[in-house]
């Protein structure tokens, strides 16, 4: 029986501020309305593996699915094979493992005089009927932050013949991700 794992590593460098938020249910008065997810040990921003997996799967589904998958289990065979399938009637674990991407260029940014690795962006929405403003504060990882990306691909007997095809899809997904945005507010220049 063949069994192996292939580790794919890369770096994600932010071209713009990135917001992947967390709950602010217990925020103190005056705190940021929407903080970013941070590593509890270093207090530095991270990119959750679930965000990378979800965004990549979503982008690939537009290319590889015959129609938009509205529920678990409606993805085509290749995406189900790579990302898994949560459908009750045909549950299947995927071949890919996405690790959390940790912030790795603290020293580089320190040498440039950076004092904080996140920024708070003030935004405002205006009610179209009442013209009432709704200001809010959104925390973002700053541009030029670098995160260590790691993806694990599992090879088994059943997948051995499909490795080349799978990696073509993975590379397509990485390219699509590079050309799109990650996190919230992408249409407003984030991520």
Language model: regions and residue ranges:
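RNA-binding basic/glycine-rich loop and surface signature characteristic of RAMP-family CRISPR effectors
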Residues: 1-126, 130-191
């Amino acid at each position: 029986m063949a069994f192996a794992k292939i580790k794919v590593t890369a770096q994600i460098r932010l071209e713009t501020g990135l917001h992947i938020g967390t709950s602010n249910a217990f925020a103190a008065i005056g705190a940021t309305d929407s903080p970013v997810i941070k590593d509890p040990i270093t207090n530095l921003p991270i990119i959750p593996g679930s965000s990378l997996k979800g965004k990549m799967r979503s982008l690939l589904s537009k290319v590889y699915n015959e129609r938009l998958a509205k529920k678990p289990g409606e993805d085509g065979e290749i995406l189900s094979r790579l990302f898994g399938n949560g459908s009750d009637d045909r549950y299947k674990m995927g071949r890919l493992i996405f690790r959390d991407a940790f912030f790795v260029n603290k020293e580089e940014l320190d040498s440039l005089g950076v004092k904080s690795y996140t920024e708070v962006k003030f935004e405002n929405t205006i009610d179209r009927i009442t013209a009432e403003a709704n200001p809010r504060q959104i925390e973002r990882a700053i541009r030029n932050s670098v995160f260590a990306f790691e993806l694990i691909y599992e090879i088994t007997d059943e997948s051995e013949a499909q490795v080349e095809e799978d990696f073509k899809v993975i590379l397509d997904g990485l390219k699509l991700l590079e050309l799109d945005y990650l996190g919230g507010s992408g249409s407003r220049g984030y991520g």
